[in-house]
From Swiss-Prot:
It comes from Bacillus subtilis (strain 168). It is a multi-pass membrane protein. It is found in: Cell membrane. Belongs to the nucleobase:cation symporter-2 (NCS2) (TC 2.A.40) family. The gene is pyrP. This is Uracil permease.
Length: 435
């Protein structure tokens, strides 16, 4: 646990001025990633800001104000949302997000009763690591299309060197910030990259700023409400695309809680308990699905802010959530976000999606997965080829389809459960995942 000086404890209330300044730091840390996800999947960034704020406040309430964590849009669900939206529209994506939230809740209840051993047995690093790699690499074509083409959503793609140059400049700015900046600025390379890329795009004439000028200061976000904007319908196809991702993101959630516990110097997995943290994520994701927002997850960027500032106050986190919620209703901010060219987002995504894939590789390295063991080699190889190759199982009746990352995760879990494991390896695995 950390023994460094603490500037504000978890339950300490800051002074008004420092409260606002500390909260804005957390807002800037999560802003780039939180608005990027809805931009990539064709959802409203303003709604994502609102759901990020509401979800974080709900999380703080459920965890009894004991865990200083901020929740933002989850990158893991980008591909499944795009897939489900293509076949069933935005409403289907919201149903899928709702199901993912329910799965979080179910897992939280099981962890409360049974502990985490069963989850670690189903989803060890040899399964989760390759699936995370698939998530990142599976998004590579999306990043490339946004960077290279004038309109990545057009039926006929037209290559644009101008757009590609904007993406390249955006990527360069983001990389420079990530490597050379220090302190808080090193935590917001995505936001700085988007701003820098946007300014360069203005000089290239590919930004339409008129909607920002025309937008009202106050505007209600484009919420998607069940039974009003769509009729919810649960299908096997939606469940198959979204639910497996929820299991994979559990490992990410547990990892964040372990890191957060070390940073703050308190064992949040024991008190208030991992089950409460996951239940908080469950409620946040369900609330997001009810108004048109993407599934949520705890953000590593904000853990970085905590580590640098040594300000652990949940009141600061709550302040950031309230500001994000308010920003969602400022029409000009929403219009400004919408005016960001796809090339800028593509440039940032080159790095972000690669980092996602690299984090899966890092998980394998950190857990010392032995690839001289044929069992590990087989599980990883099959997951990677199925996931990156885009394999799918389709049943014509009922439109049921399991594809890509979801299928890779399912096959990986099955292989992990049925392939024999040496007794020595079982003992090592048990030690690695004891929480």
């Amino acid at each position: 646990m950390s023994k460094k000086k603490v500037n504000l404890g978890v339950r300490d209330v800051p002074t008004p001025f420092s409260w606002v300044s500390f909260s804005l730091q957390h807002l800037f840390a999560m802003f780039g990633s939180t608005i990027l996800v809805p931009k990539l999947v064709g959802m409203s960034p303003a709604v994502a800001l609102v759901t990020s704020g509401i979800g974080t406040l709900a999380y703080l309430l459920i965890t009894k104000g004991q865990i200083p964590a901020y929740l933002g849009s989850s990158f893991a669900f980008i591909s499944p949302i795009i897939l489900v939206k293509a076949t069933g529209g935005p409403g289907a994506a919201m149903v899928g997000a709702f199901l993912a939230g329910l799965v979080y809740g179910l897992i939280a209840l099981l962890i409360r009763q049974l502990g985490t051993g069963w989850l670690m047995k189903i989803l060890p690093p040899v399964v989760v690591g390759p699936v995370i790699i698939v998530i990142g690499l599976g998004l590579a074509s999306t990043a490339v299309n946004m960077a290279m083409y004038a309109d990545p959503n057009a039926s006929e793609l037209v290559y644009s060197l101008k757009h590609f140059s904007v993406a390249g400049v955006t990527l360069a700015i983001t990389i420079i910030c990530a490597i050379f900046l220090r302190g808080f600025l090193s935590l917001i390379p995505v936001l700085i990259g988007i701003i820098g890329g946007y300014l360069f795009a203005l000089t290239q004439g590919i930004v339409n700023f008129q909607p920002v000028l025309d937008a009202k200061w106050f505007a209600v976000p484009e919420f998607i409400i069940p039974f009003k904007d769509y009729s919810p319908s649960v299908t096997l196809g939606i469940a198959a695309a979204m639910v497996p991702v929820a299991f994979v993101t559990m490992s990410e959630h547990i990892g964040h809680q372990m890191v957060l516990s070390k940073v703050v110097g308190q064992d949040f997995i024991k008190k208030p308990g991992l089950h409460r943290s996951i239940m908080g994520d469950s409620v946040a994701t369900i609330l997001a699905s009810l108004i048109g927002g993407p599934p949520t997850t705890t953000y590593g960027e904000n853990i970085g802010v905590l580590a640098i500032t040594r300000v652990f106050s949940v009141f600061v986190i709550g302040g950031a959530a309230v500001i994000a919620l308010c920003f969602g209703f400022i029409g000009k901010i929403s219009a400004l976000i919408s005016s960001v060219p796809s090339a800028v987002m593509g440039g940032v995504s080159f790095l972000l999606f690669g980092i996602i894939a690299s984090s899966g590789l890092r998980m394998l390295i950190d857990n010392k997965i032995d690839y001289e063991n044929n069992r590990n080699l087989i599980i990883t190889s099959v997951i990677l080829v199925i996931g990156v190759g885009g394999a799918f199982i389709q049943v014509s009746q009922g439109g049921f389809q399991v594809s890509g990352m979801a299928l890779a995760a399912i096959v990986g879990v099955i292989l992990n459960l049925i392939l024999p494991q040496a007794k020595e390896e079982q003992a090592d695995t048990s030690e690695q995942h004891h929480i």
